[in-house]
């Protein structure tokens, strides 16, 4: 809106958008209690507050950008699976409810042990559930397509299948070189922004940006799925949710950090086996299920969880 006459072009290497935004499996969440506790070991209370607030404001911006009716958001709430009460749960819930209260003007963490049986989870492996009423689900594919329609309506052009090979700056303009099959196509622009998340390491090798692969598994529809919501465990490294009568489960990167520190898409069979075991032994015990599909996505990580947004030049 600042420069309505400017021509804007987005170059996307995939036939369909292939970034982490389309592969996050629809978790509109901002951090489980154990993840926030883990962050607080290296971050101050103020930094933890700011981190959660940014995530919440990002979700609010998404809701403002896309009309709620089109976002198809499901407010089922979020839950964390607690396996052992090796910490003072009541004290920590009170502490972080107090810390994060100004963001919501409300408490956000509540014990929900009674729902372990209701949801059909393992009563021998779980000792508690923590409920968060402010977390939701979205359809990431539909969300991205609706964002595309908004951009197109404002005159923004999008070219898919444009794999950027290199760029150069000379004569007050950028020259961006793309390749599709064996065809080289060059674009020129006065200004340029690189928004490729983990893949930005290719252009900025000295930046604190490292790839981290995550995988998602989706079951076939189940006859009797007992739960709805977004669920996390193991300090947020593992997550699952319902999608209609299916279960979407993912994560487990912490089981093999070294192999998953890659920008190559693919499935880690060791992690896949662990996720399937969790479905059998914790989440869908006494239920038969089949895996229908799987995929991977690449995220970006650094020494800090703060996003890197900065200008490298005036252009």
Which residues does each PLM region occupy?
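Glycine-rich FAD pyrophosphate-binding loop
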Residues: 2-23
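Flavin-binding catalytic cores
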Residues: 223-224, 261-296
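Glycine-rich active-site loop/strand segments that organize a redox cofactor
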Residues: 19, 23-53
